[in-house]
């Protein structure tokens, strides 16, 4: 069967075990997900913490609507992320780039000063200083020209 944490404490005490308490750093630290609504709330909290860390490091996100940054993404200074930008996997963004709107990158490397508008990328490399035209799809070992 399934037990809630409060049930487990009671059962342990009834068996003669010791129980104690500890203080959580925040109310968010003890939240759980028993349904889709609670899971969505936990996801919102996690995404917010990741976004806040990048904002404090100099990433500009003028409108966070639809901006999702994965936990393993690295972003250089002075990068702008526009609405609908989703960065996943081991994606790395060099400094002074503009991504979005509606750019989705997974496991990509974007060089310094590049501009990507409505680009889909998976495992690709964007050389520094590139302006990738809207609706470009890059997969696998695709690489932009250095020119």
Predicted regions and their residues:
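Left-handed beta-helix
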Residues: 1-147
